[in-house]
């Protein structure tokens, strides 16, 4: 079987104009904790006192420039990566002014597999979850688009492969995992990615457990007889229909499983848990748990959001209603393809994919 014609038709060989954004940096622990929750749906006014109190407790954030990759087209017409290397300078403190911008913000959420089994085998980290979040600060509209990990894309500088391979390639190179995933999405989807935030499996578990677990309404029974377990083993999962209160490890299994359905149902579960986490956080008195959460998340979350942007997004969260958080899917814009070697891919109809992206990123007038 040959892939559909559109499998080999990629976006026009033109680089996406890089958006204006700060250079990637490792944030202070308080910023990491707040960002991870903020992106899970916008926690409104609860975040503002946490931000200010944490800033007083941990001091100012020092910015150290690091390289980031951008896409260029070589004379052969194929995409390659180059590094924008900033001039070295002494770290300088970053203040926390109010944000007065009105431009749309696109944030890439990454769930990263750094399990001991991968480390023991010498394997690089892998992006297990990718969700593109687009926020319009004027209309207060939010769009969320899960990106299936089996999606066949052109990875700049590496050729055609599943999109979740981009993180591993980047992690083994100077481009970094988040940097190469961001460049891959910008090139294939034609959308700028202004920021990223990533959390590893342990960070996700800690977020859920620190919030006291999460309650999810399972729409249909889920059975998975081959869910990955510790020590290169498998375990059997079963989730009955109805309301289920899950601890962190159970919630992680719920969002990762896909043997009983497909990547699109898996993406829907990921969005469902993010929304449930948002509701759980809003119902709790977060100030009582802020320091606990900050300590728990140390080393498990990374982002290039600046503290000033975190504060601005926290203020914006006050005015975002849950009915204005919209979910999107690539289902219907991709088709199944089994390669001769037995590998499975999702092949995109790129005009249809870009139409979905346009619908998510163009707010009503």
Q: PLM ranges: what are they?
A:
Residues 2-365:
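Non-catalytic, solvent-exposed segments at the cell envelope interface
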């Amino acid at each position: 079987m040959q892939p559909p014609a559109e499998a080999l038709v990629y976006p026009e060989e033109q680089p996406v104009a890089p958006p204006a954004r700060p250079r990637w940096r490792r944030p202070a622990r308080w910023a990491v904790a707040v960002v991870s929750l903020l992106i899970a749906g916008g926690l409104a006014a609860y975040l503002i006192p946490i931000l200010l109190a944490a800033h007083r407790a941990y001091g100012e954030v020092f910015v150290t420039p690091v390289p980031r990759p951008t896409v260029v087209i070589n004379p052969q017409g194929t995409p390659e990566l180059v590094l924008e290397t900033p001039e070295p300078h002494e770290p300088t403190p970053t203040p926390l002014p109010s944000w007065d911008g009105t431009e749309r913000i696109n944030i890439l959420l990454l769930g990263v597999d750094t399990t001991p089994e991968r480390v023991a085998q010498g394997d690089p980290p892998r992006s297990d979850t990718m969700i593109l979040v687009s926020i319009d600060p004027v209309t207060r509209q939010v769009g969320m688009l899960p990106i299936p990990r089996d999606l066949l894309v052109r990875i700049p500088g590496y050729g055609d492969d599943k999109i979740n391979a981009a993180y591993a390639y980047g992690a083994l190179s100077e481009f970094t995992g988040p940097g190469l995933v961001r460049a891959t999405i910008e090139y294939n989807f034609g959308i700028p990615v202004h920021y990223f935030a990533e959390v590893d499996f342990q960070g996700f578990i800690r977020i859920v457990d620190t919030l006291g677990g999460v309650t999810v309404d399972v729409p249909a029974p889920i059975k998975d007889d081959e869910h990955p377990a510790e020590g290169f083993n498998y375990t059997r999962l079963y989730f009955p229909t109805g309301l289920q209160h899950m601890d962190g490890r159970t919630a992680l299994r719920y969002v990762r499983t896909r043997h009983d359905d497909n990547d699109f149902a898996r993406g829907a579960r990921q969005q469902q848990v993010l929304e449930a986490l948002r509701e759980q956080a809003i119902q709790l008195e977060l100030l009582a748990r802020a320091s606990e959460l900050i300590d728990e998340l140390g080393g498990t979350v990374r982002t290039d959001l600046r503290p000033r942007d975190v504060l601005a997004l926290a203020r914006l969260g006050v005015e975002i209603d849950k009915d204005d958080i919209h979910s999107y899917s690539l289902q219907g814009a991709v088709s199944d393809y089994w390669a001769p070697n037995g590998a499975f891919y999702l092949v995109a109809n790129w005009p249809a994919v870009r139409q979905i992206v346009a619908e998510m990123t163009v707010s009503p007038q």
